């Protein structure tokens, strides 16, 4: 039941992000083995262009952000102390893509430099063997929608375990960012 709730919440979050991507640039990929089996990746990594990298253990759920012990690190090149780290961020990004595509780093970096990130990844992943496939948002049934929308298994804190479900909501704290999906 917990994985159903978290998977449903992820689907809602992805759809909310896509709805606010007017240029169609948001991409989420899932790695697959040579035989086509999905690879479970527990790591949480966010790379924004050559400007920011975040690596850590926290998840985008209330339990992780408020109740569990998590450790994240972020390098933001907009901060003076991190100036000049853009090439390092790009190398990490390209190395991760190369690993999941089972290709040499140099080839991945060259194709992305020539074609751009999205076009480069789309070109490089069109091959047999290990690859990246776009994350597809699953269709949610009524139970999954209820789990996602009401945080039944992911209250914001211990005090909310007994709060009426009608007062809960996946994006309640993020309304200023996303609004209701």
Model-identified regions with their sequence ranges:
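PLD/PLD-like phosphodiesterase catalytic module centered on the HKD motif
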Residues: 1-181
